[in-house]
Amino acid sequence: FYVTKVNRRYIATLGLSLVLLGNLSSTQSPELIILMISRFCAGIGAGICYATCTASLAGSHNSARTFSILLFVLVAMNALIFYIFPIIDGRWGVNGLFIFFLLEALPIFFVLPLLPRYCTEESGENIRVSEPNDPELQVQIPDILPRMCLAAVFSFYILVGAYWAFIERAGAAANINAGFVSGALTWGQVFSISATLLAVWLAKRFGQSKPLLFALFTMVVTMLVLADRVDKLTFIFSIFSFSFFWIFIDVFQLGTLSNIDHSGRYASLVPGFQGVAQAFAPTLAGTLLYYQLGYSSVMIMCALASCIALCIYLYVYKRLLELAPVVADSN
């Protein structure tokens, strides 16, 4: 909540400093306690930076394009990391990875002056939208709507956390070759880049809400297909469908919150809700497996999580159509 009150350049500087301090400390001692503290410090710093980034981008008036660029960069960096980390680890060990994180953070200090110091719009429930008959209409948006969007983010990331934690094991349990599984996961990540490009086009044509609802529905179907049976065909279908629509949904979730609240207060909370859900989901899925309910039960749980998010966004969309149609179908 400080993101709307404190100079964002100071917040980002604090986050980057924690990242640098945490990664530098990680190289100094192999002691478990020290390493845990230093990784916690680096993680908090990275979270602060990510939250400040999403809050600042929320002020954009073309949020689908803005967050598509953000997700494109994240996916591209993940692909680079998958390629370069084994090389770094093989040559310099785990300390090499920490140094990589440290060096990666240093150049960001040079772009801090580009960050907006403060939100340019008032935080609260008044959203300025354009109507044909009244170009500066003030519309009252209930605070419950962005909060419901955060609940939907949490629910969807239950799916994400559980799926990523157990999809490889589900493939192995179905006697799918490990090389096939690894290849499908890699190419699925590469394929997901196309989602960031398609999201911009769809947002311009249909707005953000309709593609978001369709993507969540498709994710429900994908999980139910995998719950029915796991073989090579359904496995590769689920990997490519999940990888594509995950990025797709992320763009529109952030974009929807940004259209409702340009202050960035709620968008800055998205990384926290994502992280907590991803930490909680494997435990929940593991409990189902502990009681020998099988991987199909995990996929059904994932389908339910996506269905809950779908229902929440459907309600939010209907309310926005009543209150501010331009916001409901904004790109």
What are these regions (language model features)?
Residues F1-R8, A195-Q208, L289-Y290:
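Helix-to-loop junctions at the C-terminal end of transmembrane segments
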Residues I144-T186, V190:
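Extracytoplasmic gate region of multi-pass secondary transporters
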Residues S60, I69-T120:
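Helix-loop-helix hairpin linking two adjacent transmembrane segments in secondary transporters
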Residues G47-H61, I247-D261:
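Intracellular juxtamembrane helix-capping segments at the cytosolic ends
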